[in-house]
């Protein structure tokens, strides 16, 4: 019965530019993923619709097309696995780099989406990979290396204006975490102010980017906050204060964004060595009892700021708080133990 209605839709109702065609193709592929007879035809139909819509390069469809590609990627892996075809990272890469019907030289935005799909799946495999044996650890290291290589290729082969919003965010975030974080700024700026010269296409691109604007603001701030240029760090601090003000005045504030902005203020003011500002920003983070994600680091940075202000007792309380509450979090408990011992020695020799 499902197959009957599925076939009738493609015969009578399918139209180029229809969001329903993308949605139905994705839903059908998911529905048939355990069906030996229907999974491959459903996959081919999904490929055809993705390519048809992607070749039009319509910015109004970009976000929906990205979602369709992401859906295709997950279901393609799950369906092949259900049918006993386990695809390794190289098989996935070959499939998406040579996607049926795509001209990688001409269909730049669609090609970038497909590249990003490979990266996302490889990252997911890396994150889930076990590390119990030497062989497993070697496999995980190989996946990590492949992710880095794929990002290098993505940056090399595409201009910022070629890239759809999700890809801009992911590549920007990756670059923001490297030794040259400011390389990421162009990717975030493309979301905040697209370089598209045609006003109609630019408006459509801006509308498509809107759901990623906050990611771009925070990503750009992180990149600037890691700069060695104090003026750029000051810009990052202002960006986070502006975001906090915006959320605080909103009738429906984004609590996650507020926590992230407050945490970034602690980090950026610490990088700026503005110790009173670090203490104040950390106090505000700690005042909100729902803010827990980065609390150990906030406590540590505030403890360092107290040390710089020669407030040794307050610094000790922070370091002891970390060692007492977050023993298992070695990233912060280990330096907190050393800082605690050093602070005790300083206090006792004064």
Describe each model-derived feature in a short phrase.
Residues 1-350:
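Acidic, polar-rich low-complexity tracts and alpha-helical solenoid repeat scaffolds
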């Amino acid at each position: 019965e499902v197959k009957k209605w599925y076939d009738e839709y493609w015969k009578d109702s399918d139209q180029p530019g229809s969001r329903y065609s993308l949605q139905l193709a994705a839903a059908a592929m998911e529905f048939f993923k355990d069906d030996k007879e229907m999974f491959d035809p459903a996959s081919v139909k999904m490929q055809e619709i993705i390519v048809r819509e992607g070749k039009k390069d319509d910015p109004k469809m970009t976000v929906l097309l990205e979602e369709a590609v992401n859906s295709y990627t997950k279901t393609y892996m799950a369906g092949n696995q259900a049918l006993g075809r386990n695809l390794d990272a190289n098989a996935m890469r070959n499939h998406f780099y040579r996607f049926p019907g795509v001209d990688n030289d001409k269909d730049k935005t669609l090609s970038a989406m497909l590249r990003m799909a490979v990266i996302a799946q490889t990252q997911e495999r890396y994150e889930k990979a076990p590390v119990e044996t030497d062989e497993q650890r070697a496999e995980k290291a190989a996946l990590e290396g492949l992710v880095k290589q794929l990002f290098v290729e993505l940056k090399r082969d595409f201009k910022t204006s070629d890239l759809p919003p999700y890809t801009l965010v992911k590549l920007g975030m990756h670059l923001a975490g490297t030794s040259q974080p400011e390389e990421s700024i162009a990717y975030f700026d493309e979301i905040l102010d697209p370089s598209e010269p045609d006003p109609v296409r630019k408006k459509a691109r801006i509308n498509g980017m809107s759901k990623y604007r906050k990611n771009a603001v925070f990503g750009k701030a992180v990149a600037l906050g890691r700069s060695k240029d104090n003026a750029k760090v000051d810009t990052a601090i202002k960006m986070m204060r502006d975001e906090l003000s915006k959320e605080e005045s909103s009738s429906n504030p984004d609590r996650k964004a507020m926590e992230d902005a407050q945490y970034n203020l602690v980090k950026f003011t610490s990088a700026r060595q503005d110790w009173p500002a670090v203490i104040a920003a950390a106090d505000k983070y700690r005042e909100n009892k729902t803010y827990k994600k980065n609390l150990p680091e906030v406590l540590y940075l505030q403890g360092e700021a107290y040390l710089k202000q020669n407030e040794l007792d307050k610094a000790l309380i922070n370091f002891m708080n970390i060692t007492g509450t977050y023993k298992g979090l070695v990233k912060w408990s280990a330096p907190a133990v050393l800082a605690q011992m050093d602070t005790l020695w300083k206090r006792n020799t004064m």
